[in-house]
Structure formats: structure tokens, C-alpha cells
């Protein structure tokens, strides 16, 4: 599934808000002339999301899903809009619809795991994260997400293992190394944390950005 076919960038620096609104107006007129055009409606909805017009985006995805109830891109981004509107149960329902038609879809599994965590459904979040790792064992992000859930639940050793697995699959991701440092500090394994911090500086992360973590290691 090309679920990122309507890829959204929330950096609107390239276009002013006025330009985005003008583009929306043009696409709205074109969509009125071609009501069955999914492409036009997806483009308009993506611009609505860029402007954080969650309700307008949701309504546009509603229009698409009325015609094509199983359109995965519309379901995914409507769920995204629902999340921003804090309508979490509706967001989860849309993600679940994607998984019903495309079992194991990485983006939907990831979204459901994070959404369950946001909803304080910790057991469901961890179950979903386990499923994510089992079905996508090559994805660094799958391990990192599970590690974050484990860390939040106080499962620190398990979190450390998963951060290490994420790093094995994406060794240049500085965030994973930073999360590993924080986890090592929580485990009071300060020497290992310092070694990881030194590695981060060699990777090009400014020492000033790591100052607080260095301080925590030295205040043991």
C-alpha cells in the first residue's frame, strides 16, 4: 500500500499560509468539477493538514471514504486528523480498518501502538509493539517504539535491549543513542553511559547538546 502517497510536510516555510489557502481554494474548485477525483481531494486534504485545519481535512477524507470506504491513505490521514482533534477512539477505529484490509501494515501498527500509549492503555500498547517487532524485525523504529513503551512502564532492562537492537539496525540515528544513554543512567551504569556519550560526540553531536546528560553521569 502506498500509504504515504499523500506525504505531508508540516514545514510550511516553502509556502506562506496565504499561498496554501489559495492552493486549497483552487483544488476545491477543481474537486467540485471532478467530484470522483481521489487525487484532487487527497491533495486538498493534505494542504488542510499542513494548515492544521483538522476538521476540514477530516471532512475531505470523509468525502473520499464515502466513495471508496477502504482507501488506506484516506483512512490513515483521517485517523491522523482525529488524533490531533483528540478523538482517539475514532482514530483507532480507522487504523484498525487499515489493518483489517492490510494485515501487518507497518505505519498502522506503529500508529496504534503509540495511540494506545497516549490513551494510557499500556498493556494494549505493549502488545501492539510486540506485534510490530515480530512482523517487522528489520525495522529499527519498531524496536525503538517498543523500548519507549517499556521504559515508560519501568521495564528498563528490556528497554535497553530494544534500544540496542534499534541501534544495530540504524547505527547513525543519534536519538536512539541518546535514549540508550538515558536508559543506562536509569540503570546506574554510568561508565557505559559516558562511553555512549563520547560516541555521540564522535558522530558529530555537539557536546553542548549533551551537557545535561554528561552532568547526570558525573552526579552519580
Show which residues each predicted segment covers:
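Terminal, low-structured helical/coil segments at or just beyond the last alpha-helical repeat
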Residues: 18-21, 186-220
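Structural marker of alpha-solenoid helical repeat scaffolds
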Residues: 33-34, 67, 101-102, 135, ...
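Register position in tetratricopeptide repeats
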Residues: 50, 84-85, 118-119, 152-153, ...
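Helix-start (N-cap) detector for alpha-helical repeat units in TPR-like alpha-solenoids
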Residues: 38-39, 72-73, 106-107, 140-141, ...
Amino acid at each position: 500500500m502506498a500509504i504515504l502517497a499523500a506525504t505531508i510536510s508540516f514545514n510550511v516555510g516553502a509556502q506562506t499560509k496565504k499561498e496554501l489557502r489559495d492552493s486549497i481554494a483552487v483544488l476545491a474548485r477543481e474537486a467540485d468539477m471532478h467530484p470522483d477525483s481521489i487525487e484532487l481531494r487527497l491533495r486538498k486534504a493534505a494542504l488542510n493538514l499542513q494548515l492544521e485545519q483538522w476538521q476540514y481535512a477530516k471532512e475531505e477524507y470523509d468525502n473520499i471514504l464515502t466513495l471508496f470506504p477502504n482507501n488506506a491513505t484516506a483512512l490513515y490521514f483521517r485517523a491522523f486528523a482525529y488524533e490531533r482533534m483528540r478523538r482517539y477512539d475514532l482514530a483507532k477505529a480507522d487504523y484498525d480498518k487499515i489493518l483489517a484490509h492490510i494485515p501487518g501494515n507497518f505505519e498502522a501498527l506503529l500508529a496504534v501502538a503509540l495511540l494506545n500509549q497516549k490513551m494510557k492503555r499500556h498493556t494494549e500498547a505493549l502488545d501492539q509493539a510486540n506485534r510490530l517487532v515480530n512482523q517487522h524485525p528489520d525495522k529499527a523504529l519498531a524496536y525503538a517504539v517498543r523500548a519507549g513503551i517499556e521504559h515508560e512502564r519501568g521495564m528498563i532492562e528490556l528497554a535497553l535491549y530494544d534500544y540496542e537492537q534499534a541501534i544495530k539496525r540504524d547505527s547513525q540515528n543519534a536519538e536512539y543513542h541518546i535514549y540508550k544513554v538515558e536508559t543506562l543512567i536509569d540503570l546506574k551504569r554510568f561508565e557505559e553511559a559516558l562511553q555512549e556519550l563520547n560516541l555521540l560526540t564522535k558522530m558529530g553531536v555537539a557536546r553542548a547538546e549533551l551537557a545535561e546528560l554528561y552532568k547526570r553521569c558525573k552526579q552519580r
